[in-house]
Amino acid sequence: MKEYVAGMTWGEGPRWQRGALWLSDTQGGKLWTDHDGPWRGIPLDAVPNGLWFLPDGRLVGAMMHQRRIGVWTGEQFDTYADLSAVATGPLGDMVGDPHGNLYVDDVGFAAHAGEPLRPGRLLRVAADGAVHVAAEDVEFPNGLAFVGDGRTLVVAETTRQRLTAFTVADDGALTDRRTYADLAHLIGDDVRPDGIWSTQDGVWVATTTGHAVALVRENELVTSIDTGTLLPIACCSDGGNRLFVTLADTHGLPLGEAMATKAVHTTVALLEVPKAGDTS
């Protein structure tokens, strides 16, 4: 594991597109990228959480507090879809399919503001901008990824310490809810899954307080990479054998205190992993 870039407060939603890395600093208020130049942070008035690239190559972000999907103009995120009439809490991570459907976390409560836990939901934004409730009673929904042939959607339920799977119907609806991986059982009680990324070898999971990046298959732990004192937040691959992982350093403080005082700092680490074809 080696450092790739640094400078962020809390790095979420890393995505690799056309030779460049993109990620959102949800606590630092910036969009970070090395697209068209050196690694830099672009200050934003409204910051996204999850990021994704549409089939036409446009970058979209889940604007966590404004409860909308924004499309990147090069300077700001203009509204792509308004979710404010449907969302019950801040927006979280996001993933899309080849048809232009987006699935996004409706977290249900503002964890960083100290609000009490409430069940969240998954929302589906169709290619025409229509918003649908795809799943109810998802507890602290976080990372999202398609696995296999794209007909299974996996979500990290942070406080339930597990990955939950749904079958994706032809119309985009989510059915057949089931446990994909019980991470507390497979890895340990300290696991709080955040971002995930899917490859042919399984699903990579950033476990935050579990201090590990783990590769799991359905009900199986394949491997786990210890991150020492650092907390892995999210991850993505470049489609080859490189896995990018955002790692938070709380400098010995409890995570909540470090977040509240902005004492946390994030780097991106680069892991060399066996090459596999991505299905995220």
What are these regions (language model features)?
Residues 30-32, 68-70, 120-123, 162-164, ...:
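A short loop-to-beta-strand structural motif that recurs across blades of beta-propeller domains
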Residues 236-280:
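Blade-level signature of beta-propeller repeat domains, shared across WD40, Kelch, NHL, RCC1
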Residues 1-5, 37-43, 78-84, 130-136, ...:
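A short beta-strand motif characteristic of beta-propeller blades
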Residues 26-27, 64-65, 109-120, 158-161, ...:
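Short, solvent-exposed loop/turn segments at conserved positions within beta-propeller repeat blades
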Residues 34-39, 55, 59, 72-75, ...:
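Flexible "stalk/tail and boundary" regions
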Residues 161-162, 166, 182-220:
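Loop/turn-rich, solvent-exposed surfaces of beta-rich toroidal or solenoidal domains
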Residues 166-173, 273-277:
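Short loop/turn segments immediately following beta-strands, especially the blade-tip
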Residues 4-19, 44-63, 68, 85-102, ...:
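Beta-rich, blade/repeat-based domains predominating
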